[in-house]
Amino acid sequence: MKTGIFYAVGVGTEPLDLTLRAKQVLETAEVLVTPITRAGEPSAAARIAEQVVSFSGKEIIPLLFPMQKHLDYRERLRGELLQPVRDCLQAGKRVAMVTLGDVSIYSTAAYVQQVLEADGYATEVVAGISAFSAGAAKAKCSLCERQESLL
């Protein structure tokens, strides 16, 4: 029986952007998945989260996602890349993957969540503050008003 739960967690663009929900999920997670673009380099999303939530005592699983065109993430995720995450979920653990900004906008965590859900695991998406929203706020700029469309 697949008893663990996977959370895809948006951490915003800076520590003060971390939502209360994201903080709560990261604090209670037993395992943290941190996306990296190069082996041996720290995760930008983890650096943000770590300034708000202690990673002490948590199992850390770095997942390598090189920034390359034409890379089929879903195929890699269906293979052995996610096996350590699946093992933790099979053991009933709470697993959270951090991602910059919001999970729903150009996020590897969204691919991971979709693959794990298709595999039958319980998943949840925790929204974060997107870069364009944070940027507009810093610039004191309204992105759309009245009848205008954002898209």
What are these regions (language model features)?
Residues M1-A122:
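Class I S-adenosyl-L-methionine
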Residues G101-L151:
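Class I SAM-dependent methyltransferase SAM-binding "motif I" and its flanking Rossmann-like core
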